UniProtKB/Swiss-Prot annotation:
Keywords: Activator, DNA-binding, Transcription, Transcription regulation. Induces the expression of gadE and mdtEF. Could also regulate the expression of other genes involved in acid resistance. It comes from Escherichia coli O157:H7. It comes from the Bacteria. The keyword Transcription regulation applies. It holds the Pfam family HTH_18. Residues 137-233 form the HTH araC/xylS-type domain. Induction: Induced by EvgA. This is HTH-type transcriptional regulator YdeO.
Length: 253
């Protein structure tokens, strides 16, 4: 089972360059680190202790806390917490990493407690949920952040810290492609916009299309009807619904 993230307990202060940015980490500070950037901390391992969290543990935690796995794309890659009882946390991590860890339920509660340290940190749930989504789900979340953006495969790879060839391979394993995910997301957004926005030009722009004519072509190919035809159908449905409502009110009178 692959790791989603780690909780790191710093016992000696150190300075580090993480993702091309300089940081100063203090003695007693606690970090939650996305596994995608865990390798950036490897040169400083002598300065901290850690415990890793796999997908099963994260999923159970999210279920127990009743949290929906709806995320914002491109979350923070690590979180910082302070004012934590360091002595207790040190003992917890030591136990969880020891061979004496033979009480599953107790160990699970300790793991959940370590995660909950970051519950009030901005980006906490996003970091966790992005770690348990499928690769296609992660890509979908990223493009949904700003569908008007002219997304390229490289942009997604930069967000996920993954090579283009590996991303293509993983998406193929999930029987999809970046282009298909982007198209589906844009078309769904366009269909939603048509309900409230009358201008096809504006809808095309908000869905990331520089050419309105190409947007109309893509929309027709995807849904079998033009944007104007779908918009007209929505208006008719609303009008019919309003008339039905008025009739019912009249009958009630």
């Amino acid at each position: 089972m692959s790791l989603v993230c780690s909780v790191i307990f710093i016992h000696h202060a150190f300075n580090a360059n993480i993702l091309d940015k300089d940081y100063a980490f203090s003695d007693g500070e606690i970090l939650m680190v996305d596994n995608a950037v865990r390798t950036h901390f490897e040169p400083y391992e002598r300065h901290f202790k850690e415990i890793g969290f796999n997908e099963n543990t994260i999923k159970k935690y999210l279920q127990c806390t009743n949290i929906q796995t709806v995320t914002m794309p491109v979350p923070a890659k690590f979180l910082r917490a302070s004012n934590v009882p360091t002595g207790l946390l040190n003992e917890m991590i030591a136990y969880l990493n020891s061979e004496e860890r033979n009480h599953h339920n107790f160990s699970e509660l300790l793991l959940f407690s370590c995660l909950s340290i970051f519950a009030t940190c901005k980006g906490f749930i996003t970091l966790l949920t992005n770690g348990v989504l499928s690769v296609s789900g992660k890509v979908r979340n990223i493009v949904n952040m700003k569908l008007a953006h002219p997304w390229k495969l490289k942009d997604i790879c930069d967000c996920l810290y993954i090579s283009e060839s590996l991303l293509k391979k993983k998406l193929k394993q999930e029987q999809t492609t970046f282009s298909q995910i982007l198209l589906d997301a844009r078309m769904q957004h366009a269909k939603n916009l048509i309900r409230v926005e009358g201008s096809v030009n504006k809808i095309a722009e908000q869905c990331g299309y520089a050419s309105t004519s190409y947007f109309i072509y893509a929309f027709r190919k995807h849904f079998g009807n033009s944007p104007k035809r779908v918009s007209k159908e929505y208006r008719c449905q609303r009008h019919t619904g309003m008339n039905t409502g008025n009739t019912m009110n009249a009958l009630a009178i």
